[in-house]
């Protein structure tokens, strides 16, 4: 089971092993279930496009997740 830090923030390094799509989908599914959200709908939306869509969708539903990256293209996804 995943737990959030005391300040209710989870950090994911998109440049590391936890930045892969399978990890992000699994994390989103667990967070959605813990929050009483529709995990199937969220993960289907995450999978409906490319990797950029996946991280944008995760950011949309889980604003308490902080994504770290050195990739400027990924950073643009969060500022668009």
Identify the function of each model-found stretch.
Residues 1-80:
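Long, contiguous binding/interaction regions
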């Amino acid at each position: 089971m995943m737990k959030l830090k005391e300040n209710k923030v989870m950090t994911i390094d998109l440049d590391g092993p936890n930045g892969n799509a399978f990890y992000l989908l699994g994390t989103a599914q667990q967070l959605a279930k813990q929050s009483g959200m529709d995990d199937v709908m969220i993960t289907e939306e995450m999978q409906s496009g490319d990797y950029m869509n996946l991280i944008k969708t995760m950011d949309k539903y889980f604003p308490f997740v902080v994504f770290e990256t050195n990739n400027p293209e990924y950073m643009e996804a969060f500022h668009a």
